Amino acid sequence: VITLLTLLSISCAHEAKNQSSPNSTSDTITPAFLKQEEAALLLQKEDEHIRRWSSFDLASHTVGIEGGKQGYLQFAGAQTRNWNDEETALLRKSSQSINQIIREKSLRLPFPEEVRLIKSTIKEEGGAGEYTRDTYIVLIDRLLEHPEYVTKLLAHEAFHVLTRNNPDFRKKMYSIIGFNILPKEIEFPEELKERFISNPDVIRHDSYATFTINGEEKDCCMVIYSTRPYEGGSFFQYLNIGLVPIDKNTCKAIEKEGKTVVYSINEASDFYDRMGRNTQYIIDPEEVLADNFSLLLTGMTEGLPSPEVIQKMEEACK
């Protein structure tokens, strides 16, 4: 997760009670607390997220690190820590709270048999906050400083585990806010791709929604990008959220006079009508939905400005 607005918008993990076969799924979460050595091996793997890094990503993640991408992976592994009893007790309590709501609402959520939890300094992601890979969640080593946010935090991150590992679930969730999933990834010009700022929780650029821009309906993909090369400092200083118009038939970004067209979200008059107003974490549909999911699984649904998003989500999870 690129969590620049976080503590208020995140989280999930839960505890389950039943043992199941390795390939089975569970409606609730069974947390597995990884030891430092095992966690380090996972963070040292070059997965799809790392392989897809842009030039900007590589430059911004390897400041002061020798060896390029491989040096970064070694650095990431070195950031892992062992869980202590107080932390595991807190996460188990949060898990049980979330699982109780799942059962009360009779939700059917295709969680993996267990959700692995890794403790890290998160320096590998610029101290941004929590994020996910595969079926594991990487949590910051300072959870005990703000225990009141942990349940939301875990529920938010668990959503990313679900969408990454269940295409049908992802498609169903994205449709709640009007996003469609394309049969293949969108093709962007290299000049824009190399300025993308990657989010570990966003699987791929293959979704779009229709927005009204300058009075015209346009099919657009949301992207996080920089307008300039990396020149030092936190990558959050460079972060921009854009809407790139696409041709949904060819799955290609639309260019004008040889340049990629990128609109700001403020140019879409119906942006918040589409995304809802339950969260300010609007950098990607994945994050908007994850925040709404965390609200649903923590029971924090009273008085929301866009209750219809939560209602549709609950119905879709049954």
Region annotations inferred by a language model:
Residues 1-3:
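Sec-dependent signal peptide recognition
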Residues 10-11:
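C-terminal motif of bacterial Sec signal peptides marking the signal peptidase cleavage site
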Residues 19-89:
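N-terminal mature-domain "stem" immediately C-terminal to a signal peptide or N-terminal signal-anchor/transmembrane
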Residues 73-134:
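Auxiliary, metal-adjacent structural segments of Zn-dependent hydrolase domains
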Residues 81, 85-93, 145-153, 280-288:
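Soluble non-cytosolic domains of exported or imported proteins
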Residues 120-155, 164:
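Active-site scaffold of zinc-dependent metalloenzymes
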Residues 158-175:
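Catalytic Zn2+-binding segment of zinc metalloproteases
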Residues 175-318:
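Metalloprotease/metallohydrolase-associated module, dominated by Zn2+-dependent proteases
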